[in-house]
Amino acid sequence: MIPRLVITTGESAGIGPDIVLATAAASWPAQLVAVGCMETLAARNQALGLNVSLAPYTSGQNTAEHRANTLPVINIPLNKPCTPALLNPDNAGQVLAQLELATELCRAQECHAMVTAPVHKGIINTAGMPFSGHTEFLANKTSTDAPVMLLTAGALKVALATTHLPLSAVPESITPHSLEKSLRVLAGGLKSVSYTHLTLPTSLAV
């Protein structure tokens, strides 16, 4: 099966659109679908001197491996014009709309996984939308009780005992009960993953 990955472009004034376009310039053994502002992507495409062909994504189309210099896009326009490196709280809602749509696509099995470009937590909160990170946002949208973040680097996999917390709050948040919950989620998750780069480890260190 060829997986279809939905990629959020993140904060439009940041590096997110650039990362997505640079990714789309190469070939990949999966189908890529971007969620973001088509106008911003087109402007960054030109400014970076790339030649990525942007086209609207059609729901339900057959899955095919990504061809270099192409990018299907689900357009979510910005509220205000975007200037690179200049944050605008009026556009913060568009960032969260990307995540909401990407989550819906995965839950509907239209897409098989989500990749997220960087966001700016500060500007989202300044806009009056409480946001501590992707992990908590996705946990809330999917009614997930105990989300666990997993970092991978080759054969090494590191699960974090907390999500996004101030450092001062970390010690009191780690308890025998919370560790047991996280370890159970980790063990169950690793057993259910079929991709070769995330096979069940032969040892577990705590």
Predicted stretch roles:
Residues 129-153:
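Short, acidic/small-residue loops that bind anionic groups at enzyme active sites
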Residues 73, 147-149, 158:
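Conserved beta-strand scaffold positions in the cores of enzyme catalytic domains, especially
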Residues 151-184, 189:
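Ligand-binding beta-strand-loop-alpha-helix segment within the catalytic cores
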Residues 54, 138, 161:
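Short clusters of hydrophobic/aromatic residues that line enzyme substrate/ligand-binding pockets
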Residues 1-134, 173-198, 203:
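Contiguous, glycine/small-aliphatic-enriched amphipathic segments in soluble metabolic enzymes
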